[in-house]
Design a protein with these regions (language model features):
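Glycine-rich flavin
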Residues: 1-100
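DPxDG-like acidic metal-binding loop motif
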Residues: 90-125, 129-130
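Glycine-rich beta->alpha junctions and the first turn(s) of the following alpha-helix
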Residues: 135, 143-239
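Generic structural signal for well-ordered, non-transmembrane alpha-helical segments
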Residues: 197, 233-240, 272, 276-283, ...
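Extended, amphipathic, non-transmembrane alpha-helical segments
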Residues: 208-210, 245-248, 284
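C-terminal helix-coil-helix/basic helical segment that borders enzyme active sites and/or dimer interfaces
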Residues: 240-277, 290-298
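Short segments within alpha-helical structural elements
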Residues: 284-291, 322-326
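Glycine-rich phosphate/cofactor-binding loops in nucleotide/flavin-utilizing enzymes
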Residues: 295-343
Length: 343
């Protein structure tokens, strides 16, 4: 969980590509476990961008404390008051929230339209038990709600301060390169390891099962069938291609940060495009595997059906939705204004 946390508080502060490598390995076994781990790990990295006072309040007693998030802006309303903001709203998809002592929430500041994020303690928000879903059931990604909660200024962070470089208020305390990586441009890297790992795990299950399976009609070994061999190749190529694309983006983000530079807009939308494209490659692999598994994959006691559900649930995340990310990339590539204000 402390993979990206600053070393000064006992974290590992690993290179950015570690998010892909570790989360995908966890997801080979369980997509929900990997999803929550990735969220909790990334929130320690994100907190390093906040003012030092906020970091000390959250990490002070327990640097391994768990932090959830619900960083969607339209559901939240923030009103500027003396010393901070009054925050209200109801946010969906706060993954792993039941185990957490804090939550990060997004809101639009009334009057200015500014996008801002807020760190809120457990006693100031309500968890709503409504995560009854098809896939990633184990994440407990429930709604959270605040009603006119005061949030001190130092527990808030403007989105404009997170667009790359040492422009955020935590830069002096956390000067490492990974804390100069732009938050929302790198969003795909935070979670895309999960569909990658799910697809890899499903591929391994599929491959192992083929060794002993015989056709119930012809009696032939499935492994001897040319069509099955081609499906194995297609699935593995899709997974390998996704991994290469994702690791390339992560390594590029790390290298730019190590040069103490911020990526330009075209680079940012390319990372978002590549993340969504990699997600589609993982989905392609999963669909090939599941269809090729036949009716065996329908049973509840077969892990392939959980892999199928979990991967499709993961790919419903906005950062992995191809149409949304491709549109943003296409606009910027064609010289039109970017439609994503967080970049």
């Amino acid at each position: 969980m402390r993979l990206l946390q600053p070393r000064r508080v006992g974290g590992s502060e690993c290179d950015w590509v570690a998010m892909i490598d570790v989360s995908s390995e966890l997801a080979r076994g369980c997509g929900s476990t990997a999803w929550n781990w990735a969220n909790w790990a990334v929130h320690h990295w994100m907190l390093a961008l906040w003012p030092r006072q906020c970091q000390d309040e959250v990490w002070g007693d327990d640097p391994s404390v768990l932090i959830a998030s619900a960083i969607l802006f339209p559901p939240g309303k923030a009103v500027r008051v003396d010393g901070g903001y009054r925050l209200s709203g109801r946010w969906p998809f706060s993954s792993g929230v039941d185990a957490c002592a804090w939550d990060m929430m997004g809101a639009v500041v009334e009057g200015t339209g500014e996008l801002r994020m807020f760190v809120v303690p457990r006693e100031d928000y309500r968890v709503i038990d409504n995560w009854h879903v098809l896939g990633l059931r184990g994440t407990g990604s429930k709604d959270v709600e605040c009603k006119d909660v005061f949030v001190a200024e130092h527990r808030t962070l403007a989105v404009d301060a997170t667009k790359g470089g040492a422009t955020h208020p935590g830069a002096a305390s956390n000067p490492g390169p990974i804390f100069r990586i732009p938050l929302f441009a790198a969003l795909p890297h935070m979670l895309i390891g999960i569909p990658l790992g799910i697809a890899q795990g499903a591929y391994e299950i599929f491959l192992e099962g083929l060794q002993a399976r015989m056709s119930r009609y012809s009696g032939r070994s499935l492994a001897d069938m040319t069509a099955v061999q081609m499906k194995v190749a297609e699935a593995s190529a899709s997974i390998d291609a996704a991994r290469l694309v994702l690791r390339r983006s992560c390594i590029a983000a790390q290298e730019i940060a190590e040069r103490n530079e911020a990526p330009d807009l075209m680079t940012k939308v390319t990372w978002r495009r590549d993340g969504a494209f990699a997600a589609q490659l993982c989905e392609r692999a999963m669909d090939v595997i599941y269809k090729s598994a036949g009716a065996t994959g329908l049973y509840d006691d077969q892990p392939l059906q959980r892999c199928y559900r979990d991967l499709h649930a993961a790919n419903a995340h906005i950062s992995m939705m191809w149409d949304a990310q491709a549109t943003t990339y296409g606009r910027v590539a064609l010289g039109l204004p970017c439609d994503n204000p967080t970049l």
